[in-house]
């Protein structure tokens, strides 16, 4: 019986969540990790080399972040977050791979508490809107191309090595 190493592409592995995820996954010998990020020379929104990669699972943690910055550079947010997701979905389609899309900040101002998955989504800034558009793209690819898609929306993630830029003073 042959064992098959799962090839897991982690896009955005240098970010807060990605750096922790890759550390945990390295402990599993049945997984081959394919780390992609701007820091290792990949422009996930436009580099055609991405389509040469073979993988079984894609974890999309890539993207530009920051609400204030999104108002100053909205084009970058829409381009990077949406096109990165589109390219990763195309890669998933090419490889018959599943994709885990990590999203955030899509609920806007809470209409009720606690906020649950049925809460309406609202893009009150370019960052949130780019995340909502990316989620919709994932749903479309899941429906039309039968790609297994999981969308996760972590909230208030914190821990070791977190950037102080994302912390709030109490």
What are these regions (language model features)?
Residues 8-26:
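N-terminal Rossmann NAD(P)H-binding glycine-rich loop of SDR-like oxidoreductase domains
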Residues 11, 36, 58-62, 99-104, ...:
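SDR active-site strand-loop-helix element
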Residues 33-49:
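Adenosine-cofactor binding site in Rossmann-like domains, unifying the SAM/SAH pocket
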Residues 48-80, 91:
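NAD(P)H-binding glycine-rich loop region in Rossmannoid oxidoreductase-like domains
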Residues 68-76, 109-114, 163-164:
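Conserved catalytic-core motifs of eukaryotic protein kinase domains, centered on the activation segment
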Residues 86-126, 150:
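Conserved Rossmann-fold NAD(P)-dependent oxidoreductase catalytic core, especially the SDR/UDP-sugar
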Residues 113-114, 136-170:
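NAD(P)-dependent short-chain dehydrogenase/reductase
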Residues 126-133:
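Active-site helix of classical SDR
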């Amino acid at each position: 019986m042959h064992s098959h190493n799962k090839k897991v592409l982690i896009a955005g592995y240098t970010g807060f969540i990605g750096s922790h995820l890759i550390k945990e996954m390295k402990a599993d010998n049945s997984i081959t990790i394919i780390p992609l990020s701007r820091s290792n020379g990949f422009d996930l929104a436009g580099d055609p080399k991405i389509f040469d990669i073979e993988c079984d699972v894609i974890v999309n943690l890539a993207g530009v972040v920051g609400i204030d910055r999104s108002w100053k550079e909205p084009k970058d947010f829409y381009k990077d977050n949406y096109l990165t997701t589109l390219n990763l979905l195309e890669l998933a389609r090419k490889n018959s791979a599943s994709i885990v899309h990590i999203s955030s900040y899509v609920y806007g101002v809470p209409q009720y508490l606690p906020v649950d998955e049925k809460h309406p989504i609202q893009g009150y800034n370019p960052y949130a809107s780019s995340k909502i558009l990316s989620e919709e793209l994932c749903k479309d690819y899941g429906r039309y191309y039968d790609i297994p898609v999981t969308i996760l929306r972590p909230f208030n993630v914190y821990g070791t090595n977190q950037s102080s830029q994302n912390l709030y003073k109490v």
